[in-house]
Amino acid sequence: LYEDDAEYWMPYEWGQKSVTDHVSLFFEDKTLLRMRIDRLKNDLSPLEWPPARTNRHLSNVQITEDTGDRVTATAYLAFVEYRREEQRWFSSRVTWSLHTEGDSFQIAAKRVDLLNCDQESGHLRFATPM
């Protein structure tokens, strides 16, 4: 789904304009994203046991730009994680930059703006909302 040079960004501040001006919760390329996914799927990772059960709900999907070979889309995401008798909810606005190739799309960039991005703790261990 992701282009080889894709970027996945989760800003630390609401309305953050640039990845270089401030620390981010996540700023990963395809290699780091793959490492995170592999770690979450690894049964030998004690910090990830038992594995989280997750649910995602997208709503209000909109195409905000279409240049023919590039499409920008936004949506609202409700992400629920249940693990170790704790259920946590995350709400966010997601923006995708998609590269079109024939009848398919590849993700060139993904930005996830968490509603509670600036809370003091709790983001470090949640499963990546793909």
Which functions belong to the PLM regions below?
Residues E3-T74:
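A solvent-exposed, acidic/Ser-Thr-rich amphipathic alpha-helical stretch
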Residues K17, E81-R83, L115-D118:
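A short local loop/turn or secondary-structure capping micro-motif enriched for an aromatic residue
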Residues T64, A78-V80, H99-E101:
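Solvent-exposed residues in well-ordered beta-strands and their adjoining turns
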Residues T72-T74, S91-L124:
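Short beta-strand edge/turn micro-motifs at domain boundaries
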Residues F79-W89:
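Short, cysteine-centered beta-strand-loop-beta hairpins and adjacent loop/turn segments enriched
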Residues L124-M130:
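Compositionally biased, intrinsically disordered linkers/stalks adjacent to structured regions
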